[in-house]
Amino acid sequence: MKFNEMTYTRPDIDALLARCRELGAKAAAAPDGDALVRLYYEQSEAFAEYNTAANLANIHYTCDTRDAYWKAEQDFFDANGPAVTNASVEISRAFLANPHVDALTEKFGTTCVAGMKNAVLSMDDRTVELQQQFNALVSRYQQIYGGALVELDGKQLTIPQLGPYKEDLDPAVRRAAYEAEAGYFDAHRAELDELYGQIVQNLNAQARVMGYHDYSELSYVRMNRIGYGPEEIRKFRDQVANDVVPQLQKVMALRAKRTGIAHPAFTDLPILFRDGNPKPIPGYKARMDAARTMYHKLSPETAEFIDFMQDNELFDVESRPGKMSGGYMTSLPSYKAPFIFANWNDTSGDVDVLTHECGHAFEGYVAERDPAIPADLECPGMESAEIHSMAMEFLTAPWHHLLFGRDTDKYALLHAEDSFVFLAYGCEVDEFQHIMYQNPDLTPDERNAEWLKLEKKYRPWIDFDNLPFYGRGAGWQRQLHIYECPFYYIDYCLSTMAALQFFLLSLTDHKDAWERYLRLVRRAGTASYTELLETAGLKVPFEEGSIKGIAQQMTDWLENHQV
């Protein structure tokens, strides 16, 4: 079924909550493990209609944040979502209270019961009103960001549409693009500062109600991180600071030599090549045709997937006024259909987001068609889900010439370099958030000062050159995740460590790398992050010394593939 044929009906919340109470009672009273397993499948399916409606509403709202109807529907789910989540948690509580609960682990693997325990530990009826307030704060941030229009080159442009100007070979054009963006954020400075302060206070209040010191503790439970915690993440960040950042300084020196910009400022960093960055082929249809060919050549599984996605028009990837920034994949369970949202801006990032979100969507497509995997276990934790997307960016490389033509080698270098350099920024975002939630009374200026300290730690090569907004340490405010989903961002780093290993493997044996990837994908959400890495034969980045060799291999490859 094509996306525009999918019908939306606002769900009956009272009926859903009653169904949840019924399922909870059945789970508590299930007489044996077999009955409990059947009920687990049943409760997973019970939320399909609600989740489909919620995701349809969110798709339509983010495609046009100015549409009053979809804004009202989004408000409905913002208001009612916490009650539905809490009802789901009560079902989990009933499963956990049943003496036969170990049958779920035997049937579905380690993440099923561990995930329910995290769900119970992360939710509380006393936080429902706070959750509703948080949802409203996030929606307001999305309105500010999604409604951004700036004047440049005689045009009214959205933030994503500034992308090509930021990559222009003329430094004055690049500077003007960044200043236009900065002007918008500076104009909304007071509200953005206030919103973030309210978000920190709100989430910390939720954490304290539930017995946690602050939200940095609760977030690990809510993110359903299984088998590791803040200490492992701190060790990971330390390895990045000690073993990756020194290598990145070499990489940035190579970039400066390659571009001829001896002392690059922040506005010069998007320039990776003297004659300009790689450009994908123009035109929506041409790109979609190339993507179809690429996925047909990659594997039979991806061929079936891309045909389903394109034939059913499950992409909205072109930028336009009123459309929310960013990109995502979401699922429409009732139709067993993934959906991909993006904002193309005629830069190489268009291919990044296409292959990235197709990685998410491919995993969802595979999991939804495996009858043994309950809906609740179709997707793993986010640090694992991002492996699907980031590794897909690399594993499609043999066919990137279909999208880049003569710029293919440039894109290969840009993509590998950007992915490697990203590790530092991702760790910076994560450490910043730990500081913010552990020190909630910091003033806006103090928050920005902390960000600038972390810039020196993780990205010492950056020179803001008195750039408005960024130069005062407020650049973090344009990072959607910091407002919308705190502590999510480190997941990209953990998955990048897996993706870089897939990349290095694919250089010597692409078939083996793909088969490892497919094994990982097929486990869906039934295994933890470390278990999934072990399934694919990859190193776990929490272990001391696990990153150093990978960092050296990446630096060597980049040095040997300068264009």
Residue positions per predicted region:
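C-terminal, non-catalytic "cap/extension" segments appended to globular domains
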Residues: 115-117, 227, 354, 362, ...
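Auxiliary, metal-adjacent structural segments of Zn-dependent hydrolase domains
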Residues: 275-334, 347-348
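Inter-helical turn/loop segments and adjacent helix faces that build the functional surface
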Residues: 230-231, 254, 258, 298-301, ...
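Long, well-ordered alpha-helical segments
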Residues: 196-213, 251-255, 359-369, 390-407
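Glycine- and acidic
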Residues: 122-123, 179-188, 228-234, 269-280, ...
